[in-house]
């Protein structure tokens, strides 16, 4: 199959297994959920009644004071007491096989082509690390919410995009399923397309 290049005459011949396969929604969902789960810190921690600071002595005798009976100042119903079901640090990551991960990326890229959300260009760069220059370039291409993928990160382009909320610049090694889905359009250079094909082959 062929992908038409926006800034040059002609088209780029690409593999149908990477850019023309059916959309596997279940697989994409599983991989996206696993990717998001892997990004969770999982470091929250609370103290149980056994871990909270304080004496183990009974605050007052069982009977005769007129007050409600109490056995510990560390009880969860007391102020500064422990937490009943205290949260502990945990690993939220989910296992995803390489074949599944690659399959999900191929599925997403194919769907981007079908929806005309993937734009292939010969080259994408700016002359200086100025946000103004990048905004102007994107305006000419009628792009606003966009992920730009190059075969290697251009420092000028990276610095120019850093201050734009709806624009991100990545190299091929930095692409992930969540980013590919999150942006309205994805711009890829011809070299990046070839590199993606090699990576997912």
Curated annotation (Swiss-Prot):
Residue ranges of the region described as Disordered: 44-71
Source taxon at top rank: Bacteria
Keyword Ribosomal protein: yes
Keywords: Ribonucleoprotein, Ribosomal protein, RNA-binding, rRNA-binding
GO molecular function: rRNA binding; structural constituent of ribosome
Ranges annotated as spanning the membrane: none
Gene Ontology annotations of biological process type: translation
InterPro entries according to UniProt: Ribosomal_uL4 (IPR002136), Ribosomal_uL4-like (IPR013005), Ribosomal_uL4_dom_sf (IPR023574)
Keyword Phosphoprotein included in the entry's annotation: no
Cysteines paired by S-S bonds: none
A Gene Ontology cellular-component term: ribosome
Protein family per UniProt: Belongs to the universal ribosomal protein uL4 family.
Assembly description: Part of the 50S ribosomal subunit.
Protein function: One of the primary rRNA binding proteins, this protein initially binds near the 5'-end of the 23S rRNA. It is important during the early stages of 50S assembly. It makes multiple contacts with different domains of the 23S rRNA in the assembled 50S subunit and ribosome.
Protein name per its UniProtKB record: Large ribosomal subunit protein uL4
Originating organism: Photorhabdus laumondii subsp. laumondii (strain DSM 15139 / CIP 105565 / TT01)
């Amino acid at each position: 199959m062929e992908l038409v290049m926006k800034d040059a005459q002609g088209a780029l011949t690409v593999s149908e297994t990477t850019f023309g396969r059916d959309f596997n929604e279940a697989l994409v969902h599983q991989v996206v959920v696993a990717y998001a789960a892997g990004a969770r810190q999982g470091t929250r921690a609370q103290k149980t009644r056994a871990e909270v600071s304080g004496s183990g002595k009974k605050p007052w005798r069982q009977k005769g004071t007129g007050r409600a009976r109490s056995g510990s100042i560390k009880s969860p119903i007391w102020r500064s007491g422990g937490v009943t079901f205290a949260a502990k640090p945990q690993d939220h990551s989910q296992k995803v096989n390489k074949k599944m991960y690659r399959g999900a990326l191929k599925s997403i890229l194919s769907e981007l082509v079908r929806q005309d959300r993937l734009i292939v260009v010969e080259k994408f760069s700016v002359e200086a690390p100025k946000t103004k220059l990048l905004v102007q370039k994107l305006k000419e291409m009628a792009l606003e919410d966009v992920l730009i993928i190059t075969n290697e990160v251009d420092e000028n382009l990276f610095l120019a995009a850093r201050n734009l909320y709806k624009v991100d610049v990545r190299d091929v090694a930095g692409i992930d399923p969540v980013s590919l889905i999150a942006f309205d359009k994805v711009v890829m250079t011809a070299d990046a397309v070839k590199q993606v094909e090699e990576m997912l082959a």
